[in-house]
Amino acid sequence: RAGPRHILKRAIEIAKSKGFDSITISPEIEFYVFNQNVSKFTEIKANQGYFIAPSLDVAKEYRKKLSDILMDCGYPVKYHHHESGKSQHEIEISALSAIPAADFCSFFKYIARDIATRYTFDITFMPKPFSNEAGSGMHAHITMLKKGRNTFVDETDPFGLSQTARYFIGGILAHS
C-alpha cells in the first residue's frame, strides 16, 4: 500500500474527488551512451553538443531503433535527439495518463539498456556521471484538466501560472 504505484493511484483518486478530469504526463528522459568496455562509462561516443549533425551522431541509429520499438509497444515517441552533454541523449514521448506514463518510465530503462547491448553500448541514467558535462534528468511535463481546461494556466499572470500551478509546484517541493 505504500508502493509508488499505489501512491499514484491514490493521488489520482484525490484529484478526481476535487473535480479534476485527468492527469497527463509526458516523460522526457536523458541518458549517456558509452562504448562497452572493461572500465565502464569512460569512453564518450560523441564530442558535439545539442542536436549535433546526424553524420557526427554515432548513436542516432541506436536512438532510432529504441524509438521504433517504443512506438511498436504503443508509446508515442514525440522526438529523440542528442543532448547538450558529450554522448548525452534524450527521448520524449507524447502525453499519457499518469499510470501508463509511470509504467513507461520503468519500461524505458529496461528496454533502453537491452537495445544498447545490441549496439555494443552501455548507458547510464546517473544524474551527473561527469563533473564537466551536463547532468541528465527526467522531466515530467504534467497537465491537470478540469472541465477540459488546463488548470495550470492563467493568461493574466505574468508567468502564465495559475494559483493551482503554484500550489502544485509547492506540493512537489514539500514532498520531494
Predicted ranges, named:
Residues 1-176:
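Glycine-rich, acidic/polar active-site loops that bind/position phosphate-bearing ligands
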